[in-house]
Amino acid sequence: YAILDYHNTTSYCSTVANGHVGENGHEDDAKGLINFMNGTDYFDYNGDCNVTQKREHVLGDIYHSQLVEIGPPDASTDFTAPNEEAYFRSANNYQGFRKNNIDRRKVIYAGSNSGMLHAINAETGKEEWAFVPPFIAGLMPSIINKDLDGGVDVTYDDEGNKVAKGGTNAVFGVDGSPVVHDVYMAGYDSAGNLDTTKSWRTILMIPYGRGGAGFSV
């Protein structure tokens, strides 16, 4: 998707003394789109033409994506037969993995249609970080709707001044539900080298749902 020239010299907010508003070309809009995803009001939802302030509602809609909480490992090692997954855990010292991570903080994960996987601290309710999958990043310019520049939800304030709110399209982003599982595998160290031995790791897979065919791990 191409990034549209949303704010330019003929746009709704063209007269604002701001370095990111009223410029022709796409460079300001590329930066504005990134800032919008980070919570700024680049598309002027409150109609005051201040595109550097924080939006009142930052989080995109969580539609089909279910919330998944990851805390201390708690899978069972109680088994009655050797063909059970619990037997495999017990035979490969899952108990040690569980003990070593008993204080792992609880984090809630969910995908939103702002194109991000969100990690939210389960105790404080504050977002710790968000991840934009590369495939979904390529879809983000599709939220820009040039026809909505200054023409969405037009209202008037107490003094009779026109207030226009706009302007993005609703799209599907990270629309699938995260899946979590403890896996016994060889991973990579901080230098990117493959480990020589296997160990237990908690793996989070993020399908995109209606955002597109694919997933991230």
Report the location of each language-model feature.
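A fold-level detector for beta-propeller and closely related beta-sheet-rich head/sensor domains
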Residues: Y1-V217
